[in-house]
Structures are given as C-alpha cells and as structure tokens.
Amino acid sequence: MYIDLNADLGESFGNYKIGNDEAIIPLITSANIACGMHAGDFNVLNQTIELCKAHGTGIGAHPGYPDLQGFGRRNLDMTYDEVENLITYQLGAIDAFCIKHGMKMNHVKPHGALYNATSGNEGLAEAIVNAIYNFNPELKVMGISGGTLVKATEAKGMTAINEVFADRNYTDAGTLVSRKQSNAMIHHQQAAVEHVLRMVRDNQVKTETGKLIDLRADSICVHGDGPEALAFVKAIIETLNNEGIKVQTI
C-alpha cells in the first residue's frame, strides 16, 4: 500500500518569506506550487521548481484567485470564463519554469477559496477542469475526496486525486470546517497523526461532531505555511512507515 504526501508551497514573494520549503520539499512526494496570483512570484516559482527537481518531488500547479492581500482565501465574484482564463494563465507561468528546468507538471490543485468554492458548484468545477484539459489532458487534478471537482475530472476522462487533509477538521458533509471557525485546524501532532492514519488505513474520517464517514485517500495534504508543518510531515511519514504504508508520488 502507498500514499502520496503533498504540501502547498512556493508561497513566499518579494521580501516576504512564508513556510519552510527547503526543509519540507525533500520529505514530501508532491508539491503544490503557488503561481503568483494568491502568493509566490517569478523568483520563488523558479527556486521551488529547482528544489523539486533536486529532490525528485512531483510538481503540481497551485492556482488561486488573484488576491495577494487575502492569500487567496477570500471568494471573488468571477464568471466561469474568467476562472478558466485565470487557471490557464497560471498554468502557463509554472509550465514555463518546468520547461526551463527540464521538468514536467504532474498535477493541478486549486488553492484556498477557489478549491473550496467548487464544492457543490458543478459549473465552477467544470470551468477549472476544462482549463486544465485544454492545457494538457494528461495532468491529474487534485480535489477534496469524493467532491465535485473530483467528479468533474473523472467525467472528463481525466485522472483525479482524492485528497485528504492532515491538519484540517471535517464537517459531517465531508467538507472542510471553515477557517472562520476556531476548530478548523488541527494543531496537535498526535491528533494529526491519528487523523491521517484513520483516513489512509481505514478510509474513514472522524468529523467535528465525532461522526465517522467514509472517504478515499490518494494523497495527504499538510499546509506548508503552518508552524507545525515540518513536525507534522516527519511524524506522518514515520507513522505510515511503521504501518507498512509507503509514501510515494501518485
């Protein structure tokens, strides 16, 4: 049995440093790299792909809303056509640096509010998938396990990656608890490890109300901007290895 381990990275820009990419990238198997709209810039994009190449880490695009001030975590009122163009623009940016370094993208994962907004919104999910398909139909699409984006990807005949979150709590509907709520994040390492093990080994998640619901886990996400990220990644890998579960790029 194996599982992919991903993190959202490349989120520094200019003089502002976010996350600990240099320490995390050698440990994970897939990196979701900001493309300059919600975070990141041309230098950071270049450096992050260099790091991925050096450590054999799978490269993924992490396109978000054009909202540096809100870190892409605020909803923007955009038409489906605008979203499709937004995704295409960001895919072009990261692909240019992949070409520069002789690398290829493996997957695409929308960021933040854009990712969450696909839940129950088939039109938005289809706009994102169409942009990716028209850019490169071989790219995999990462979305919340069993969600609208995953279904839209599969309907297009593309490969979907069912993602679960090590550091986020879930609602009874299988969506992520809003960051506006105090219990959105999991801050304790042991709780995160138990959370991951239940999802990967048992294909279940315990929701915020204590209910167990079924889900599929293809890839585990740890948010790279969190202060606990590096410790979480190390603990998760150790626990999975002890369970005989191999961590590798999907």
From Swiss-Prot:
Enzyme Commission number, as recorded: 3.5.2.9
One of the record's GO molecular function terms: ATP binding
UniProt-listed GO biological process terms: carbohydrate metabolic process
Keywords: ATP-binding, Hydrolase, Nucleotide-binding
Record's catalysed reaction(s): 5-oxo-L-proline + ATP + 2 H2O = L-glutamate + ADP + phosphate + H(+)
NCBIfam families: PRK05406.1-3, PRK05406.1-5
The protein's assembly and partners: Forms a complex composed of PxpA, PxpB and PxpC.
Name of the protein in its database record: 5-oxoprolinase subunit A
Organism, scientific name: Macrococcus caseolyticus (strain JCSC5402)
